[in-house]
């Protein structure tokens, strides 16, 4: 027994020293114990335990436990001390239950000390960040950095849609909302992929030069004149398209392919109202549509796409046209009768005129949506014009186009009677709008056909 007692006493003494060190650590953090008392707690022994009992009663062990209890452990008291110490002051700031640092003036809480110090300066009015060139002072370092750009002339923030530059991010956001009608996106900030998307969109718009787009023209022949299209302010409409919608449409267009049915695609097509108008051609002027080339046949997709025609010798640029899908399935059909001579020639050559006014571009009512690379459709499912060597996916468009050819001479304009040499000259005739120059004949035919604007 004489050998075991020293071991027990030594164990209790070691445990008391451990508690003393823990108490000293807690007191150093909370700042509730002065330096003199901290020196006394480092001496150990019974005096350390008494000082611990006097300063921190909640952390002290009962005297009976140190004398009679061989274990000498009072674990619940140690656990309570750790729980209570979590709510104590840390670096002069009180911590909340979720571990954040709480402001002593209000209910603001922050995980970082630097952010909390900046917040406290709002209450104290302290502005340590001062400009050496003017009386400007701020409580935030980032505000001083933005202010110094006004002296240096640096403008790191640039608008992706125009040449506007500014020194502050908030000014750029205001510019987007005011100039480009760009609504702020709720939630998180745009990711890097969205920024790259805007960069690609900017390059595409700059390459097109904001010129006229080749779109489906629903106007009668009397309205096909050399004037700016209603999309001349295309650059001001692009920013209204949100980046999320842009990516969604882009992914959808790439994932569709040829696996879907043309009728299903026509339901999802934003231009599906054109098919309704095309179905009323028996009583209304025919809508405008563009021809297609045998090299790149049309393919069902969610939006019209561009088809290039072989360039004529007299014209340097390629004729870019677009073909809209119809809700009715396409089937081969022969050349229509001559009673279509008064129909609008927009199905092919006339739309080529609008195609020549711009480079091969995207044809869609939503101009920010890119046109994916589309595979070639089987020519047997298309309507073929033997004179112009063009393919049409719509029977109505094919009928309108064939009505532009003369009955005796296929390369004679059925609108104004102008005779062309070949298919290239015939296409250039409508692309230039030459038939509109014959005002007397066009006026007579418009009156005869009861065509109204």
Swiss-Prot record:
UniProt cross-references to SUPFAM superfamilies, sorted A to Z: beta-beta-alpha zinc fingers
Zinc finger C2H2-type: from-to: 101-123, 129-151, 157-180, 383-405, 411-438
SMART domains referenced in this protein's UniProt entry, alphabetically: ZnF_C2H2 (SM00355)
An example Gene Ontology biological process: regulation of transcription by RNA polymerase II
PROSITE patterns (UniProt xref): ZINC_FINGER_C2H2_1 (PS00028), ZINC_FINGER_C2H2_2 (PS50157)
Keyword match Nucleus: yes
Any Gene Ontology CC annotation: nucleus
Superkingdom in the source lineage: Eukaryota
Molecular-function annotations in GO: chromatin binding; DNA-binding transcription factor activity; RNA polymerase II cis-regulatory region sequence-specific DNA binding; zinc ion binding
Main location: nucleus
Keywords of the record: DNA-binding, Metal-binding, Nucleus, Repeat, Repressor, Transcription, Transcription regulation, Zinc, Zinc-finger
Polar residues bias: start-end ranges: 279-293, 356-368
InterPro entries reported for this sequence: Ikaros_C2H2-ZF, Znf_C2H2_sf, Znf_C2H2_type
Residue spans of biased composition, Low complexity class: 315-332
Location relative to the cell: Nucleus
Region entry Disordered, spans: 279-375
Keyword Repressor assigned: yes
Purpose of the protein: Transcriptional repressor that binds the core 5'GNNTGTNG-3' DNA consensus sequence.
PANTHER family listed in its UniProt record: ZINC FINGER PROTEIN, ZINC FINGER PROTEIN PEGASUS
Note: 'Pegasus' was the winged horse in Greek mythology.
Subunit structure, as described in the record: Probably self-associates.
Family (UniProt): Belongs to the Ikaros C2H2-type zinc-finger protein family.
Name of the featured protein: Zinc finger protein Pegasus
Annotated gene: ikzf5
